[in-house]
Amino acid sequence: MCGIVSYTGHSQAAPILLDGLSKLEYRGYDSAGLAVRNGENKTRIVKAKGRLKALAEKTDNGHALAGTCGIGHTRWATHGEPSETNAHPHTSDNGNVVGVHNGIIENYQELKNKLLRKGYEFYSSTDTEVAVKLIDYYYKKYEHTPVDAINHAMVRIRGSYALAIMFQDYPGEIYVARKDSPMIIGVENGDCYVASDVPAILKYTRNVYYIGNLEMVRLANGTVTFYNLDGDEIEKKPTQIKWDAEAAEKAGYEHFMLKEIHEQPKAVQDTLNSVLKDGAIDLSSVGLTEEELQSFSQVYIVACGSAYHVGVACQYVLEDLAQLPVRVDLASEFRYRNMPLDPNGLVIVISQSGETADSLAALRLAKKKGLKTLGIVNVVGSSIAREADNVFYTLAGPEIAVATTKAYSTQLIAGYCLAVQFALVRGCISKGRYQDLISQLQCLPEQIQKILDDKERIQWFAAKQANARDVFFIGRGLDYAISLEGSLKMKEISYIHSEAYAAGELKHGTISLIEDGTLVIGVLTQSELYEKTISNMVECKSRGAYLMGLTTYGNYNIEDTASFTVYVPKTEECFATSLAVIPLQLMGYYVSVAKGLDVDKPRNLAKSVTVE
């Protein structure tokens, strides 16, 4: 949520800042601003409410702002309404300190009251202005030493934050600090870059540094210096980003989401290949040994949003194949419950960005209680990747659309591979069955491509449903997990009210919501539950529902019940989520397109939720 881009070097800063901010639009925002300084001159600040193009128009695409040092920001309102006044950057009373901030300062009112007593005045409703003026207060108190000033402010701020600060007394320099909010540093040919995420600076450099929690950075004269909370210098090594800038472009597709849907065969294949060696699953890169796999008596899966839906699907697969008890929790609930945890348990935390605030907090809680932790993440060097005991990296590449598709699919693959290996090591499946499962996994990319090649039928049907008022997804067992993700895709990008229900629960209240014309989508990939779900669909139809069925090739008798049916290739039933979710992603996408909505940046949503 929110985005920060900063630059100091030899080129004009403002166009670079605007370009970087455009690569962070997927994070969600309601206003934007720039602060640029030209040598010894005072910093110029320009802000605009609304989309980034308004800021670009105000600054002639950045060319109207002279200067080679600057900070930029896209704001997601938390404290104070969306407005130019509340937009970042913010400044101290005398303009000596200028800064931007991501995150939430929990004790901002307490700090604000302190500063009011010290004679400070406030022009905005934001917690960011409080942080900037707190730094200014300590800067004056500790005799013009930026590192000490920021250090003292960090000690007193409670909450999560990433800060980029410029000081009038230090032209050409930028100071950065973070706690529980992501920030990266890039260096190339004497130029220094700061960003909330890699795509913002990938056009300029692939050499990045990840700032640790409660660390600070000084960028000056083409070099970066890292400090700990005590103000002592620390050494860091850069990380080389493997993917290129083109991977974060639309490549001819109308939307990033459609591009990323079509990238799923490759993303799934790449993630599989990362752990498949000589026809077997090799988890050495993950760091889990066979002895450890045998020792776990319980698995906890913790995640948010679509990653939580991955967890629900993987629960079924792990329990079925490995006969291992699995508990799935929303990270925002897990972290606040005082529940007993099995000391021999494994806590799996799933997060595309590796920075999801609640998931990161849940990981830290699990580690504090002494449990082994495993992160399934897509971003190398992210907070969860650094702090988890073990990491399974998905190879989805950059995912720009807010609604996840390929990251979700690669997370499923990670879960499948863990489940299959657990099952073999624990003696729950034979070697022959193990090889069969791996063969089925290797078929998934081609099967996903087959579904994508036949997407026109889904596009046609979706256009007819653009005016739907309610959509209900129903399924049993693993099909319920699929329904959860299908429903989320529908509601988050088409703004149609949608819910997913375990089909067996319909009679316990939900069926009262069914009326003439209500679209009900039944998911039926599990053969043992097929007839029961058909019966539930018939119950809905008798109350006026319009039925769509989603099942595997061969189940053609569903056409006696459903008015429209989508078929997916047959696979091992425990892997069916990977195929059945594709038509539901396309359904949500095409409904949104038919309604003329902003598919990649739906209202009120952010790609990476880095605040609680």
Language model features with spans:
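Catalytic-loop motifs flanking and including active-site residues across diverse enzymes
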Residues: D127-V130, V310, C314, T410-G415, ...
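Conserved short alpha-helical segments that host acidic/polar catalytic motifs at enzyme active sites
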Residues: M1-E254, E263-S295, Y336, K431, ...
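Structural beta-sheet core signal
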Residues: I4, G99, I165, V176, ...
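Generic C-terminus detector
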Residues: Y546, T561, T571-E612
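Active-site phosphate/pyrophosphate-binding segments
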Residues: Q264-V268, L272-Y300, N390-L519, S592-E612
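Glycine-rich phosphate-binding loops that contact phosphosugars or nucleotide phosphates
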Residues: Q294-C443, V523-P569, M587, K595
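Glycine-rich oxoanion-binding loops at beta->alpha junctions
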Residues: T68, G72-T85, V275-E291, C314-I350, ...
